[in-house]
A protein has these predicted regions:
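Active-site/ligand-binding-proximal alpha/beta "capping" segment
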Residues: 158-200, 204-205, 214-217
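Mobile, glycine- and charge-enriched loop segments
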Residues: 36, 61, 69-78, 183-189
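Structured adenosyl-cofactor binding patch, chiefly the S-adenosyl-L-methionine
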Residues: 203-243
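Generic structural signal for residues in well-ordered beta-strands
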Residues: 60, 142-146, 216
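Short, ordered loop/turn segments at secondary-structure junctions
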Residues: 65, 107-109, 221-222
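RNA substrate-binding interface of SAM-dependent RNA methyltransferases
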Residues: 69-165
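N-terminal positively charged helical leader segments and presequences
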Residues: 1-68
Length: 243
């Protein structure tokens, strides 16, 4: 069943936006009376039946509300700024790997620079990438994208999480080792993963994360590109927690 998101709360009857209508009826060629799963801006989820198309807008009626699956652990990616397509690729693949929240932060070695104006201009495109990835992979909840915070602020905001930082000089401690701790004591701690930019984290930044209760982890014997590291780390978490 096709899963879609709309920018309004759910109700007994809903009108799908024009772009969603086109996607459902003319790209996927679903017929009137077809059932779809819809998530609204209120994060409620329901099964709807398409009833009609009027002026390019599909009209749908509620069949039943359904519960959205909730994970025991919230997964958080703290991604240093990357250049253009690399960052967009990370956002897309992180969404497919069921990340819950993505923080985009400036760190010392970032090649890409985003001031407030540039962040604002890019934000809607980044959100659209994550929305389309969510619909493609069948998620019922959209991940949250947060920009404009510093690494220090994020660590404070997520102080109760299990904080991990991918570090090329860490030799033995893995994500699997770190997750054993929360699996063994049955806690529902959120899992936060920090990934550096193309130039990696500076040693001071690694130490700052560790001083906030973080742990450096290795992603293997090879040094990965920044965008590869993010997806590798999330894949490891996904495997350990969900498979």
């Amino acid at each position: 069943m096709k899963k879609i998101f709309i920018p309004t709360p759910l109700d007994e009857s809903i009108v799908l936006p024009k772009d969603v209508t086109h996607h459902i009826l003319h790209v996927f060629r679903h017929n009137i009376e077809k059932l779809i799963t819809v998530t609204g801006s209120d994060n409620r989820c329901g099964i709807y039946q398409i009833k009609d198309e009027i002026n390019g807008l599909a009209q749908a009626s509620l069949i039943e509300y359904i519960d959205s699956p909730t994970a025991m652990h919230r997964t958080i990616l703290v991604q240093s700024y990357l250049k253009g397509e690399k960052l967009e690729w990370v956002l897309q693949k992180a969404t497919e790997l069921n990340v819950d929240t993505v923080y985009l932060v400036p760190t010392s070695n970032c090649v890409a620079k985003y001031d407030a104006k540039k962040l604002q201009s890019k934000y809607s495109r980044w959100e659209k990438i994550m929305l389309e990835a969510s619909q493609q992979c069948g998620r019922t909840q959209l991940p949250t994208l947060v920009v404009g915070e510093t690494l220090s602020n994020v660590l404070d905001m997520e102080s109760e999480s299990l904080k991990l930082v991918a570090y090329e000089n860490e030799e033995g401690y893995t994500i699997k080792d770190a997750l054993k701790a929360i699996n063994s004591d049955s806690t529902n701690r959120d899992i936060l993963i920090c990934i550096g930019p193309e130039g990696g984290f500076q040693e001071k930044e690694i130490n700052d994360i560790i001083e906030c209760g973080g742990q450096s982890v290795t992603l293997g014997n090879t040094i990965l590109r920044a965008e590869t590291a993010a997806i590798a780390a999330l894949s490891m978490v996904h495997y350990e927690l969900e498979l």
